[in-house]
UniProtKB/Swiss-Prot annotation:
GO process terms (BP): proteolysis
Binding of Zn(2+), residues: H93, H168, H427
The keyword Zinc is assigned to this record: yes
Signal peptide positions on this chain: none
Name of the protein: Probable M18 family aminopeptidase 1
Record PANTHER family: ASPARTYL AMINOPEPTIDASE (PTHR28570), M18 FAMILY AMINOPEPTIDASE 1-RELATED (PTHR28570:SF2)
Keywords for the protein's UniProt record, in alphabetical order: Aminopeptidase, Hydrolase, Metal-binding, Metalloprotease, Protease, Zinc
Cofactor(s) named in the record: Zn(2+)
Gene3D superfamilies (UniProt xref): Aminopeptidase i, Domain 2, Zn peptidases
Naturally occurring in which organism (per UniProt): Thermotoga neapolitana
Family the UniProt entry places it in: Belongs to the peptidase M18 family.
Entry EC number(s): 3.4.11.-
Pfam families, per database record: Peptidase_M18
Amino acid sequence: MKMERKNVWQHRNREEIESFSKEYMDFMGRAKTERLAVREIRKFLEKEGFVPIEDFAGDPMDMAVYAVNRGKAIAAFRVVDDLKKGLNLVVAHIDSPRLDFKPNPLVEDEQIALFKTHYYGGIKKYHWFNIPLEIHGVLFRGDGEEIEIHVGDKPEDPVFTIPDLLPHLDKEDAKISEKFKGENLMLIAGTIPLSGEEKEAVKMNVLKILNEMYGISEEDFVSGEIEVVPAFPPREVGIDRSLIGAYGQDDRICAYTALRAFLEANPKKSIGVVFLDKEEIGSDGNTGAKARFYLRVLRQILKIQGGPEIQNSHSMRYWKKSAVISGDVCAAVNPPYKDVHDLHNAPRSGYGVALVKYTGARGKYSTNDAHAEFVARVRQVLNERNVIWQVATLGKVDQGGGGTYAKFFAERGADVYDMGPALLGMHSPFEISSKADLFETYRAYRALLEDL
């Protein structure tokens, strides 16, 4: 009668967990930005025979198609029946907290060249000082040519860093928000002056090096997107190697497990995965959830199937026949800080995929609150498939709050449930997940894609 927690390690084959974890870590080492994540996901899809939807020319009741939105979001669908009967969907976001170059980033101060940044998403600013950093992104030159920038991800590359103030001179008892200011998040770019230059000679030398490497000028930064991320690979954590430490596990751990579940599923009805951008800053913009680019893809599928192309997304009745799993992480109980949790409703590392009925803040503001009927369906499928799960909430009532994509998909009329692994150190440069929870999340997503 009593609900008891189960430790995944005591119920699963360790070799399976380790094999899956290694492949996941390889993916995470390559997918450190949303653009790079889309590139990796696309490789997985094309390897399994998926084609861009505009190139599809086969059986409309047997489709394996995908679509990319501006290189920052991607959706894929396996259609096995009339789409108007509905589909099962897992969604996740592939953006993560980071630093972005400002539009005019390069300055010189005290004979040190620096790149100015603006932080993206909810970070603790002090996390980003005194660690090795790498940069990735694109620039468009004045002639329109696209230039990819990648520095710091190879062993032979230099890295960047943001130096902090030494403790000997940092005796003031100031607030953290005052000690670590956003304007001080500047990367060291160089210290060697360009011979013959009298003014900003170090900055000029950095520009000279960039021009030699990429053929770019300072003005080209205006039409660029350069992202700053930690310059260390995913690592196993703990003497028993049971955990994974990596940047960007919120939320690329859900993206990877959803992708694997999607590609390996044997569905009875049409299924899909949607990986979107901008979740960490409110889901705005035309690559975020509010833009609903996936609906345009679904309309194309309906048109290919011979039905009327529905112009008004609100009239998509099939959406009400669909089930959506919002794949996102939650906060695992961290022993030194467990007082922020309601421990009776908090997830633990190693105890399976976490089911989150609602997020939001205060009085459940700005959330999707999954209906009991849908929760019952999900629970039944997970239990029938022997998936180990646990319940989760985002801390004590009024402790704080947060949100996911769930509410945006619920607005279309589908039932939606938040679900994913619990992390330690979420939104830090080195988030911690359990290998066991990683594997169990994959098993949960696959079960729900197949049987909901």
